[in-house]
């Protein structure tokens, strides 16, 4: 909780501003969307902001604003997670210092079997869906969201599946960042 004025807080650290939206052609539905998304997009933008505020070293950029805009071009499952992972690479490529990568994955259950990185049909099946954004080096959870009630044992299994997916993704992202760094230097 921030105490004092907003301007004082911005004088001490950077403001992370996020926008999340779906392109009009990204889904099969043909309903008209507002230009900057709907209520769900606003909620996901807030989650994105909270996830990156946990990772970006905002104190190094007082009186600054870091904008992260995510637009999903093809909504085929795990949209928010794909946006988080892409934004992580973009922030790193921009040279903004971070405590750790922010890696995100979904998880769910298919007949008691935990699944990670759900596709659109798996998400649409209606079972409980878990979204995990993780800082893998520290194990800190930046975001944990569950779409339905779930028994504790099943929750632990789904959380473990999402955590393993995030750690595997971290290895892939880290390898890509290191290759990019070799190209640049």
Feature-to-residue mapping (PLM):
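Polyanion-binding surfaces on beta-sheet-dominated domains and ring/shell assemblies
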Residues: 1-185
